[in-house]
Amino acid sequence: MPPAAPSVARSREGGGIGQRRLVFPKSARRTLPCPIALCLGLCLAAAAATTTRASAAAFASAGDTTAMSAFNLLHLVTKSQPVAPRACGLPSGSCRDKKNCKVVFSQQELRKRLTPLQYHVTQEKGTESAFEGEYTHHKDPGIYKCVVCGTPLFKSETKFDSGSGWPAFHDVISSEAIEFTDDFSYGMHRVETSCSQCGAHLGHIFDDGPRPTGKRYCINSASLSFTPADSSEAEGSGIKESGSPAAADRAEL
């Protein structure tokens, strides 16, 4: 007849309710060798501890799941909130509304006389590929103008190599030549630059330029035309444009 297996009993000694101890039948204590009895006792103790830990883990897991679900819900709600743009501070009747621009062209006309890239950049706020623009490494003296309406924007003396891949200038010919608008596209905040006369998109402005202004006007080559210094007049008007027919067909309202 096989020896009886030990059992687990609760001890009430010293008020220790809930504590467990191993109780071996007398027959087992008489017949089982000491090593075997010890092994059985250790196995039963390990099983009891595992059961207790499993129960605690189940409760903890349920709590963690609830907490994680609440966190995920909060995360999704937060992510779904749109970025609240700040007021761009444009004056009433700004040229960003094409009807209020001083110089207005029909889209049909612009598609005819601008290249696809020039149209995309100036009218659709596109961006040309870095280091591929016509004026990225251009160093000739002269004046850079809006490719759409011919408004003088930058002098070659203010152009510098920013290493960004686009033409960069640290100052403008006139503070009234360019308008600034808050741009929250692509999940970031930038300041867009556009021509104040026709509303053409030029690029963006940053605060990491050289002295004396500390500004960097990062401008698309496709937004610009260039007039050599030897062909320009005193005020930059009546100049023969290089690479741009924009000024010839300009219609002022």
Swiss-Prot record:
Q: Where in the cell is it found?
A: Endoplasmic reticulum
Q: Where is the active site?
A: C218 (nucleophile)
Q: Which residue numbers does the motif Endoplasmic reticulum retention signal cover?
A: 250-253
UniProt keywords (A-Z) are:
Acetylation, Endoplasmic reticulum, Metal-binding, Oxidoreductase, Phosphoprotein, Signal, Zinc
Disordered, as annotated region: 227-253
Q: Which GO terms describe its biological process?
A: protein repair; response to oxidative stress
Residues that the record marks as modified (Phosphoserine) are S244
NCBIfam families linked: peptide-methionine (R)-S-oxide reductase MsrB
Spell out the subunit comment: Monomer.
Protein name, entry field: Methionine-R-sulfoxide reductase B3, mitochondrial
Biological source species: Mus musculus
